[in-house]
From Swiss-Prot:
PANTHER family: GTPASE ERA, GTPASE ERA, MITOCHONDRIAL. Belongs to the TRAFAC class TrmE-Era-EngA-EngB-Septin-like GTPase superfamily. Era GTPase family. An essential GTPase that binds both GDP and GTP, with rapid nucleotide exchange. Plays a role in 16S rRNA processing and 30S ribosomal subunit biogenesis and possibly also in cell cycle regulation and energy metabolism. It is a peripheral membrane protein. This is GTPase Era. The keyword DNA-binding does not apply. It is found in: Cytoplasm; Cell inner membrane. The gene is era. SUPFAM superfamilies: P-loop containing nucleoside triphosphate hydrolases (SSF52540), Prokaryotic type KH domain (KH-domain type II) (SSF54814). GO terms for biological process: ribosomal small subunit assembly. The lineage of its organism: Bacteria, Pseudomonadati, Pseudomonadota, Gammaproteobacteria, Lysobacterales. Residues 8-176 form the Era-type G domain. Residues 42-46 are annotated as: G2. Residues 155-157 are annotated as: G5.
Length: 298
């Protein structure tokens, strides 16, 4: 008689310092892009659920902003609160770090997770950078000697390497139970939210070095017609000089942001998109916690 394998379902927080590939890992496990990515700090600013459904179970990933040691800036304080708050009501956590690089912010994340008592899986990301994987051995030895993890997984989220065994170990940590979401759901966030994030992703990719804190995106309208989404995206900055940078010479930069964001939306929403973008100034909004909350920062 064949024994039925019990279905498992639960929530797993994805924690780590900025720019180690947490959102790339979330996207890879879900199987499609729901979290924006760039090589700039503060790309992820909100908590977002990624729903990864498999025949054996459902993993609800809680993608979080990167943990910062620097908390003088209100944005950093809010993002740290969001990351810490994501540890409530989770069954386990993924601590994501970068291959061979462990710093004080990794230790901050490790200590935070260690205090919770939940199972912690270490994901060593970006191993595709090493042709000779034996170069990882000294780092793995150091980690094992100085830290305690339920399991350790070297992976490449970008290349989707090492994910099968990671998924198997994560499912084993979850309680038996019915799925929380239907099989076709991939996130708890609305299409309106995802549209704003895809515009912000292009701003970060093209202007993140010049405007690290100063931009956010608000959706002014989002209408759905048969075969077409009409979306109006307002990009907020803090100075007139920043507005000029976002618009670019003859509007070229803003046009490029719009084109790239629209292409990403059409890929995600599986429909044609008409996207209108424009830029406005709200002085010092990122230094004002009340203003941050009006823009949806929790």
């Amino acid at each position: 008689m064949t024994q039925t394998v019990p279905y498992r379902c639960g929530r797993i927080a994805v924690i780590g310092r900025p720019n180690v590939g947490k959102s790339t890992l979330t996207n890879a496990l879900v199987g499609t892009k729901i979290s924006i990515v760039s090589n700039r700090p503060q790309t992820t600013r909100h908590r977002l659920l990624g729903i990864a459904t498999f025949p054996e179970g459902q993993i609800v990933l809680v993608d979080t902003p990167g943990l910062h040691r620097e908390q003088k800036h209100p944005m950093n304080r809010l993002m740290n609160r969001t990351a810490r708050g994501s540890l409530e009501d989770v069954d386990a956590a993924l601590l994501v770090t970068e291959s061979t690089h462990w710093n004080e912010e990794d230790t901050l994340a490790y200590n935070l997770l260690n205090d919770t008592g939940i199972p912690v899986v270490l994901v060593i990301n970006k191993i595709d950078r090493f042709k000779d994987k034996s170069a990882l051995l000294p780092f793995l030895t150091h980690i094992n000697e100085n830290h305690t993890f339920t399991t350790i997984h070297p992976v490449s989220a970008l290349k989707r390497k090492g994910l099968e065994t990671l998924v198997s170990d994560l499912l084993a940590l979850l309680p038996e139970g019915d799925p929380m979401f239907s099989e076709d759901e991939i996130t708890d966030r609305s299409q309106r939210f995802l549209a704003s994030e895809l515009v912000r992703e292009q701003v970060m990719r093209q202007l993140g070095e010049e405007l690290p804190y100063a931009t956010t995106v608000e959706i002014e309208y989002f209408t759905e017609n048969t075969g077409l989404f009409r979306i109006g995206a307002l990009i907020w900055v803090e100075r007139e000089s920043q507005k000029a940078i976002v618009i670019g010479k003859g509007g070229a930069r803003l046009k490029e942001i719009g084109v790239k964001a629209r292409q990403q939306m059409e890929r995600l929403f599986q429909t044609k998109v008409f996207l209108e973008t424009w830029v406005r100034v709200r002085k010092d909004w990122s230094n004002n916690e009340a203003a941050l909350k009006t823009f949806g920062y929790e």
